[in-house]
């Protein structure tokens, strides 16, 4: 494992860009994601791995990972429109993309053991198969009715559902 300093967070800077070309995987930590309170602040769009292949991971894992990246990229592309015109001017499909992307972002905040010092939340282990199934469920819209805050700093999808029920009860009281 090597750490590479990226001047001014510019991944296109010639020095780090040349180095990245020789690596099998890169994990990019993002100040913007950290500012959202999501730890570890890994940017799933800028991070790469040569192992992200259906031949290595299997079709389901690969397709889910690419689906997550696609939704997050579409959300990123909508950021300027949202900043200028607001959410109300988006099409219904774009609003759905934004809602799912925000849930995915928050679900990526799962309390990892290495992030306990930053979050104060105990680390949790979530099985790979459960993670894949849960993210696919978000992509498929199975959890569209759950509030995005229920996806923040939880372990598996059962915790998301339980947290959503708790939020619902608290808001009804």
UniProtKB/Swiss-Prot annotation:
GO biological process: proton motive force-driven mitochondrial ATP synthesis
EC top class named in words: translocase
Pfam families in the cross-refs: ATP-synt_ab, ATP-synt_VA_C
Alphabetical list of InterPro entries matching this protein: ATP-synt_VA_C (IPR055190), ATPase_a/bsu_AS (IPR020003), ATPase_alpha/beta_chains (IPR050053), ATPase_F1/V1/A1_a/bsu_nucl-bd (IPR000194), ATPase_F1/V1_b/a_C (IPR024034), P-loop_NTPase (IPR027417)
A molecular function (GO) term: proton-transporting ATP synthase activity, rotational mechanism
Localisation per UniProt entry: Mitochondrion; Mitochondrion inner membrane
Record-listed E.C. numbers: 7.1.2.2
Disulphide-bonded residues: none
Reaction catalyzed: ATP + H2O + 4 H(+)(in) = ADP + phosphate + 5 H(+)(out)
Entry GO terms, CC: mitochondrial inner membrane; proton-transporting ATP synthase complex
Keyword set, alphabetical order: ATP synthesis, ATP-binding, CF(1), Hydrogen ion transport, Ion transport, Membrane, Mitochondrion, Mitochondrion inner membrane, Nucleotide-binding, Translocase, Transport
Annotated function: Mitochondrial membrane ATP synthase (F(1)F(0) ATP synthase or Complex V) produces ATP from ADP in the presence of a proton gradient across the membrane which is generated by electron transport complexes of the respiratory chain. F-type ATPases consist of two structural domains, F(1) - containing the extramembraneous catalytic core and F(0) - containing the membrane proton channel, linked together by a central stalk and a peripheral stalk. During catalysis, ATP synthesis in the catalytic domain of F(1) is coupled via a rotary mechanism of the central stalk subunits to proton translocation.
Subunit structure: F-type ATPases have 2 components, CF(1) - the catalytic core - and CF(0) - the membrane proton channel. CF(1) has five subunits: alpha(3), beta(3), gamma(1), delta(1), epsilon(1). CF(0) has three main subunits: a, b and c.
Sequence similarity: Belongs to the ATPase alpha/beta chains family.
Protein's recorded name: ATP synthase subunit beta, mitochondrial
Organism: Actinidia deliciosa
Gene, per the UniProt record: ATPB
């Amino acid at each position: 494992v090597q750490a590479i300093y990226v001047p001014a967070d510019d991944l296109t800077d010639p020095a780090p860009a040349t180095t990245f070309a020789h690596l099998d995987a890169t994990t990019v930590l993002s100040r913007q994601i950290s500012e959202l309170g999501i730890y570890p602040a890994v940017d799933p769009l800028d991070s790469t791995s040569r192992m992200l292949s259906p031949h290595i991971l299997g079709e389901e894992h690969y397709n889910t990972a690419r689906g997550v990246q696609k939704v997050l990229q579409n959300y990123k592309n909508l950021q300027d429109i949202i900043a200028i015109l607001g959410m109300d001017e988006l099409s219904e499909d774009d609003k759905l993309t934004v809602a799912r992307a925000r849930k995915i972002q928050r679900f990526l905040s799962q309390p990892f053991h290495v992030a306990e010092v930053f979050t104060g939340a105990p680390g949790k282990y979530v099985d790979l198969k459960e993670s894949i199934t849960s993210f696919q469920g978000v992509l498929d819209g199975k959890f569209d009715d759950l509030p995005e805050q229920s996806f923040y700093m939880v372990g598996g999808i059962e915790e998301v559902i339980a947290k959503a029920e708790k939020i619902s009860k608290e808001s009804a009281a």
